[in-house]
Amino acid sequence: MRARFFIAFVAFLLLATSCASRKKTVAPAPPQSFEWLTANMAIQAEGNGMVYNDLSGQLRMRKDSLVWLNVTATMGVEVLRVKVSNDSVWIVNRIEKTYLAEPLDTISAQLGMPLSLPLVQTLLLDNNQGLPPVENQTVQLKTFVMGELSAKIRYNNIRLNEKTTFPLKITDKMERIRLLKKQ
């Protein structure tokens, strides 16, 4: 009797679930809007024939206002500080004891392409919406202070607001985007 009841129950479950309509997958979440963003990063960089694996960084960003990046080595020694505002860029290189304070217009002219704070934020957030179209151009990233540097950045924790914290692993596509001076 038990065996018949079990077989009937399994048959009923199969019939009840097999004929159901297929549910649609959930649509991707819309892009998050934020006022302030804080992200911790693990950075692997190559430059001057060396590989730097033990770099970490903190990115702070206020939408349409400010980008602040601190890069530290082991034991919390600050290596690089970058601040980008609406009209200027400040870069402090603690290793070579140099700094750069220039208007965005000057750096844009040196790169030979338009550069603005919304563009920098778009590149850092890997948000392709709003990027100016690049026509048949190869672009290479070269820093003014650190020399040639290729970096892979992993964001560990991103806080969009104080209430929203979630761990993410975002591969930063900036390594593929390279800015070149026009020659």
Regions found by a protein language model. Name each.
Residues 15-18:
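C-terminal motif of bacterial Sec signal peptides marking the signal peptidase cleavage site
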Residues 1-7:
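Bacterial N-terminal signal peptides that target proteins for export
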Residues 67-117:
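An acidic-aromatic
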Residues 27-48, 170-176:
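Transition segment at domain starts
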Residues 61-62, 84, 134:
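Generic beta-strand structural signal
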